[in-house]
């Protein structure tokens, strides 16, 4: 469950939800929606909104990546062999998720191995394991890296400005890229999305672009009209009910 809030409503939202829902709180994504404010005089410029994330059980999660910046690459990919520079990836289990228990090459990790023994043996034969003093690690080469995993601070998706009249058709309209990232991350390809506050229909449009089913609704007739027009323009087949 993703709930978008501006900077001053987080406490109200968490205060209003029931104890059961509050216990499912997972993380707070900080979305930098704009650049610096030049008109501030007596306080901090509010350029960040929050996206509160709640989860139940162990839901689907697909890691998203962004291009490596120079500083990150320099600090992370500092090991080198004859194949090139590489970073160290996890090869063992964790306390919260015990791995495969076995001894290999003199190592017997407390929480097991991340992979089954035959997979670990294959990595060893391919010289893809960095044997550290205390733990082994999987080599991740710079030229094969997917990029830097996106964390809970998003500064690469900007809000739709008021001047972009051809793009902004609803007061609370969110950028399409924002919804597409959320859906790719938390909804499997055969999954379904529910948006109880349709607004401009951006969530439904993002689902259409990504091949997911979506059910959305709104009490505002203006919202339904705007969303319907946007979806039809995109070539989406829709079913509407009042």
What are these language model-derived features?
Residues 1-238:
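Core catalytic lobe of class I
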Residues 240-242:
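Long, charged amphipathic helices and adjacent flexible linkers at domain junctions
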């Amino acid at each position: 469950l993703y709930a978008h809030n501006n900077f001053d409503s987080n406490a109200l939202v968490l205060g209003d939800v029931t104890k059961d829902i509050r216990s499912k709180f997972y993380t707070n994504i900080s979305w930098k929606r704009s650049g610096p404010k030049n008109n501030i005089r007596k306080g901090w410029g509010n350029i960040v909104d929050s996206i509160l994330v709640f989860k139940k059980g162990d839901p689907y999660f697909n890691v998203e990546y962004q291009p490596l910046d120079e500083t990150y690459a320099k600090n992370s990919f500092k090991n080198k062999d004859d194949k090139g520079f590489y970073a160290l990836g996890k090869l063992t289990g964790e306390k919260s998720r015990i791995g495969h228990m076995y001894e290999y090459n003199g190592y017997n990790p407390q929480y097991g191995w991340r992979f089954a023994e035959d997979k670990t043996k294959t990595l060893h034969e391919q010289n893809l394991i960095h044997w550290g003093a205390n733990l082994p690690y999987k080599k991740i080469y710079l030229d094969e890296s997917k990029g830097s995993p996106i964390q809970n601070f998003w500064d690469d998706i900007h809000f739709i400005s008021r001047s972009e009249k051809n793009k902004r058709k609803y007061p609370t309209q969110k950028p399409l890229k924002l919804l597409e990232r959320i859906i790719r991350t938390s909804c499997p390809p055969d999954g379904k999305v529910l948006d109880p506050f349709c607004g401009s229909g951006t969530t439904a449009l993002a689902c259409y672009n990504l091949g997911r089913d979506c059910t959305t609704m709104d009490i505002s007739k203006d919202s339904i009209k705007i969303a319907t027009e946007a979806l039809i323009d995109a070539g989406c087949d829709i079913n509407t009910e009042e």
